Amino acid sequence: MNNWSIDDARASYNVNYWSQGLYGISDEGEVTVSPDPNRPDCKIGLNELAKDMVKAGVALPVLVRFPQILHHRVNSLCQAFNQAIQKYKYEADYLLVYPIKVNQQQTVVEEILASQVEKEVPQLGLEAGSKPELLAVLAMAQKASSVIICNGYKDKEYIRLALIGEKLGHKVYIVLEKMSELKVVLEQAKELGVTPRLGLRVRLAFQGKGKWQASGGEKSKFGLSAAQVLKVIELLQHEEMLDSLELLHFHLGSQIANIRDIRQGVSEAGRFYCELMKLGAQVKCFDVGGGLAVDYDGTRSQSNNSMNYGLTEYANNIVSVLTDMCKEYEQPMPRIISESGRYLTAHHAVLLTDVIGTESYKPETILPPSEDAPLLLQNMWQSWTEVSGKADQRALIEIFHDCQSDLTEVHSLFALGQLSLADRAWAEQINLRVCHELQGSMSSKYRYHRPIIDELNEKLADKFFVNFSLFQSLPDAWGIDQVFPVMPLSGLDKAPERRAVMLDITCDSDGIVDQYVDGQGIETTLPVPAWTQESPYLIGFFLVGAYQEILGDMHNLFGDTNSAVVRVDENGRRNIDSVLEGDTVADVLRYVNLEAVSFMRTYEELVNKHIVADERSNILEELQLGLKGYTYLEDFS
């Protein structure tokens, strides 16, 4: 592809769309990051960043965080709602609440809070869904608006901690998820002498579409039915505490791709709000929960990995629906709250790592079968002569199907003992040779070729063995088929010569990335430059800032990766603020109740028993260094 350009590279990886202007490809073919889209010239190359960190002693893989991206996302979301409020003349304000379950890392939470430190009236609060999260939030919420929303199932201790939060000066909303919580809240509030701020999570009939759609609808795990809502109102009236009900909450699920689903959910919840107000409640806050999606594949579609709306459209729909409904039913307009954790955090983190080796198909000269070879092998050779003889486009399809059918029969006959190992090896090689020739002869401009091209690309793809654990760093790719953009960090100024799949270093066949963002949608292979030991390059996994760290699993005892916080100044210079070392082998052993200290004693006994005296100290030192070392590969050259 002699006319390859950087624009072709950008289109091939769809980077201009999924990156939201935060990541790009330079004219030199290197992947860059611009943490502040308002200053696109202030960008740095990720390849050079990774190499410099390695020189400084930070081993790959490393998770790099860009806090300026967090700041930008917070302010963009607040700005979108502020503009919508002004546009529709909405008579209340907006508050962005960050649910820390999305990423509880202290650096992340503190940077989100710091994004509005200069605002006279911060539009930022925090959400907790468990006792540990609440205890963390109680220590941090004062850095913003001091608004805390308590979701999830609650016991007496959780509720007391939330009420204590009020005594500490926070505004803590205890959202009732089930009927039994109300009694405990009222009892503990009375005992502590605190007037509680109550919220109701309503269970909507409407259910949004997506991987997390079970979060909403009548069968939802959380929330109160219409009858239960009325019962809560009755109990609060009886206790003369109806004015404590200040918040209405609903949740359609994470990653809602269709704006119509959001609009319909807000509309139904808005009716709940108006009815509660008619019953005498003084609800002040309307919490739409999560659902604001991230366009992981950049297709701006209704797929599970995308969204068919933008930030402005999201805010406009919520504000306009509530404006119209409050006017129609003559009710005051409540403060709008959203819990948009995925949107805030996904883009800010990228995993940078190295390729430790590749396995690729290289065409070989294959001799024809002997005259007395089985007819099946003769047929496969005939397929090869036809495809190498430049068969017409429609004949190529027949050749492909014939060759695949023949190979299947070869495997069956080998299992029955009717073909030798040499016969099988020859058949597999000629099949690959035919497929390779077909791959070069078929064209995606023919619709009937496209599914076969996809199959050929997958069959002939290079295998890239990448220094990371899918289960630790991209658990959603394995667990729910989430798509994450993947790109080589350099060499993109040249046309990709290969297609590849990324395999991790765990001993598990599921440790493979099997979906890739492509300019044409989602593909099963990734276009890449040729990789060799002499001209290697690094790989980046993008949009991994939401959920992946906390959901990561220590399969094969691969632990947390190294991580770094990086900023880019107004002159385009990078500053590495901090580096957090990943887990050592001793760390991960301790997680599963294996003690490195006792292992060292055992090693000493074995060394003294089996190793000659002049080698003992070196062997022991190497074992000790192994326990102190990184869980990922460090020396594979």
From Swiss-Prot:
<dbReference type="GO" id="GO:0008295">
    <property type="term" value="P:spermidine biosynthetic process"/>
</dbReference>
<dbReference type="Pfam" id="PF17944">
    <property type="entry name" value="Arg_decarbox_C"/>
</dbReference>
<comment type="function">
    <text>Catalyzes the biosynthesis of agmatine from arginine.</text>
</comment>
<dbReference type="InterPro" id="IPR022644">
    <property type="entry name" value="De-COase2_N"/>
</dbReference>
<dbReference type="InterPro" id="IPR002985">
    <property type="entry name" value="Arg_decrbxlase"/>
</dbReference>
<feature type="modified residue" description="N6-(pyridoxal phosphate)lysine">
    <location>
        <position position="101"/>
    </location>
</feature>
<keyword id="KW-0456">Lyase</keyword>
<dbReference type="InterPro" id="IPR029066">
    <property type="entry name" value="PLP-binding_barrel"/>
</dbReference>
<dbReference type="GO" id="GO:0008792">
    <property type="term" value="F:arginine decarboxylase activity"/>
</dbReference>
<keyword id="KW-0745">Spermidine biosynthesis</keyword>
<dbReference type="GO" id="GO:0006527">
    <property type="term" value="P:arginine catabolic process"/>
</dbReference>
<dbReference type="InterPro" id="IPR000183">
    <property type="entry name" value="Orn/DAP/Arg_de-COase"/>
</dbReference>
<keyword id="KW-0460">Magnesium</keyword>
<comment type="similarity">
    <text>Belongs to the Orn/Lys/Arg decarboxylase class-II family. SpeA subfamily.</text>
</comment>
<keyword id="KW-0210">Decarboxylase</keyword>
<protein>
    <recommendedName>
        <fullName>Biosynthetic arginine decarboxylase</fullName>
        <ecNumber>4.1.1.19</ecNumber>
    </recommendedName>
</protein>
<dbReference type="InterPro" id="IPR009006">
    <property type="entry name" value="Ala_racemase/Decarboxylase_C"/>
</dbReference>
<dbReference type="InterPro" id="IPR040634">
    <property type="entry name" value="Arg_decarb_HB"/>
</dbReference>
<keyword id="KW-0620">Polyamine biosynthesis</keyword>
<dbReference type="Pfam" id="PF02784">
    <property type="entry name" value="Orn_Arg_deC_N"/>
</dbReference>
<dbReference type="GO" id="GO:0046872">
    <property type="term" value="F:metal ion binding"/>
</dbReference>
<dbReference type="InterPro" id="IPR041128">
    <property type="entry name" value="Arg_decarbox_C"/>
</dbReference>
<dbReference type="GO" id="GO:0033388">
    <property type="term" value="P:putrescine biosynthetic process from arginine"/>
</dbReference>
<dbReference type="Pfam" id="PF17810">
    <property type="entry name" value="Arg_decarb_HB"/>
</dbReference>
<keyword id="KW-0479">Metal-binding</keyword>
<feature type="binding site">
    <location>
        <begin position="286"/>
        <end position="296"/>
    </location>
    <ligand>
        <name>substrate</name>
    </ligand>
</feature>
<comment type="pathway">
    <text>Amine and polyamine biosynthesis; agmatine biosynthesis; agmatine from L-arginine: step 1/1.</text>
</comment>
<keyword id="KW-0663">Pyridoxal phosphate</keyword>
